[in-house]
Curated annotation (Swiss-Prot):
Pfam families: PDZ_2 (PF13180), Trypsin_2 (PF13365)
Catalytic class of the enzyme: hydrolase
Similarity section: Belongs to the peptidase S1C family.
Descriptive protein name: Uncharacterized serine protease YyxA
Ranges of residues in domain PDZ: 283-383
Organism expressing this protein natively: Bacillus subtilis (strain 168)
Keyword Cell wall biogenesis/degradation part of the UniProt annotation: no
Membrane topology: Single-pass membrane protein
The protein's Enzyme Commission number: 3.4.21.-
Molecular-function GO term, any one: serine-type endopeptidase activity
Chain ranges passing through the membrane: 22-42
Residues forming the catalytic site: H129, D159, S243
InterPro entries: Chloro_Bact_Ser_Proteases, PDZ, PDZ_sf, Peptidase_S1_PA, Peptidase_S1_PA_chymotrypsin, Peptidase_S1C
Coiled coil: none
Length: 400
């Protein structure tokens, strides 16, 4: 029997042909989707600088790129303050005779602040060290012009001086603010002429780093601090030419007169400014008297800590428990101290109820009093404690 194998025909179903209309719809949908996606992502590409289409649109008909001008407003509180106050901050030029022939030249320059004006005169406050030794002083105004200035008075202890100029060219006057209200962290602006008049009207900004800082000052040049200057500390850049310039609060008020800069190689510079509460009474005295009228004792002093310890017992005869005080090294017989009976080698340990640690302490308490005040002074003489009442006077009353 013969078996026949049956071949099965396997056929693939014929696919229906797409019409031209189908192709068109697919293409149209793809174009729409692509357009939507591009519209969505183009702003992001533009922000990243990849919007080539935008670049093409900035080209003119000659294929060159055009430049757009963008106006940005930069007016803020600082720029307004600077605009208003810059004309009130001036340059101060110290002119000295430089040789035996009497020729004069600029010995240095600093800054100053115009704080008062009347029909005839305007007054400028600056630092004593800026005008020290000057045979002639000039003021450089904001427009670059110079006017001659007269020295009204100066005070070495506070490092302040007052100048007077004719008022016809003065356009702006600064107002003082209350430095007692200044807080650490408060923003401030410094205006001055760092490193000379080439950088006139320079502006720096910072904050108050600290208030009531005490900086030792050697007022008589003997190499020993005899006074602590109370200053504001700021991180606003203050360079040597800034001396006498203004430290402003955000109300545009002068809260300090820039005076010193402490700079060390390992730290940032520290800007220091004399607070307005101390500036105002000094310049008022300088205007009125040409000097500051302070109460004085009429003695030369040295801190006990600066005296060799073996003298404490052998020469001064001090008890073992007395380790601080101010030693009287000399007395004017007609001074308040001389009239009260203080003598050389007396050791002052208490002034007006306050302990005296050294001569800095004593001067601090003394300058807080007024001419005419009476104070009680305790001291040691020959190992015994004594006390006297002293009526304070000013130096110009000596002998009266």
């Amino acid at each position: 029997m013969v078996d026949y194998e049956r071949e099965e025909e396997h056929t693939t179903p014929e696919q229906p042909k797409r019409s031209k209309k189908g192709y068109f719809l697919s293409s149209l949908i793809g174009v729409i989707v692509g357009a939507v996606l591009m519209a969505f992502i183009m702003p992001y590409l533009s922000n990243e600088g990849l919007d080539t289409g935008a670049l093409d649109q900035q080209q003119n008909n000659n294929g060159r790129e055009s430049i757009r001008t963008v106006n940005v407003s930069v007016n803020n509180a600082v720029t307004k303050i600077v605009s208003n106050m810059s004309p009130a901050v001036v340059g101060v030029v110290n002119i000295q005779k430089s040789d035996i022939w009497g020729e004069s030249g600029e010995a240095g320059s600093g800054s100053g602040v115009i704080y008062k004006k009347n029909d005839h005169s305007a007054y400028v406050v600056t630092n004593h060290h800026v005008i020290e030794g000057a045979s002639q002083i000039e003021i450089s105004l904001k427009d670059g012009s110079r006017v001659s200035a007269d020295l009204v008075g100066s005070d070495q202890l506070m490092d302040l001086a007052v100048l007077r100029v004719k008022s016809d060219k003065i356009k702006a006057v600064a107002d003082f603010g209350n430095s007692d209200k200044v807080k650490s962290g408060e923003p401030v602006i410094a205006i001055g002429n760092p490193l000379g008049l080439e950088f006139a009207g320079s502006v720096t900004q910072g904050v108050i780093s600290g208030t009531e800082r005490a900086i030792p000052v050697d007022s008589n040049g003997d190499g020993q601090p005899d006074w602590n200057a109370e200053v504001l500390q700021t991180d606003a850049a203050i360079n040597p030419g800034n001396s006498g310039g203004a430290l402003l609060n955000m109300d545009g008020k002068v809260i300090g007169i820039n005076s010193m800069k402490i700079a060390e190689s390992a730290v940032e510079g520290i800007g220091l400014s004399i607070p307005s509460k101390l500036v105002i009474p000094v310049i008022e005295d300088l205007e009125r008297y040409g000097k500051v009228k302070r109460p004085f004792l009429g003695i030369e002093m040295k801190s006990l800590s600066d005296i060799a310890s073996y003298h404490w017992d052998e020469t001064l005869k001090l008890p073992k428990n007395v380790t601080n005080g101010a030693v009287v090294m000399g007395v004017d017989a007609f001074s308040p101290a001389g009239k009260a009976g203080l003598k050389e080698l007396d050791v002052i340990t208490e002034f007006d109820g306050y302990k005296v640690n050294d001569i800095v302490d004593l001067r601090k308490r003394l300058y807080q009093k007024k001419v005419g005040d009476r104070v009680k002074v305790k001291f040691y003489r020959g190992g015994k404690e004594k006390s006297v009442d002293i009526k304070l006077s000013s130096a110009d009353q000596l002998g009266s």
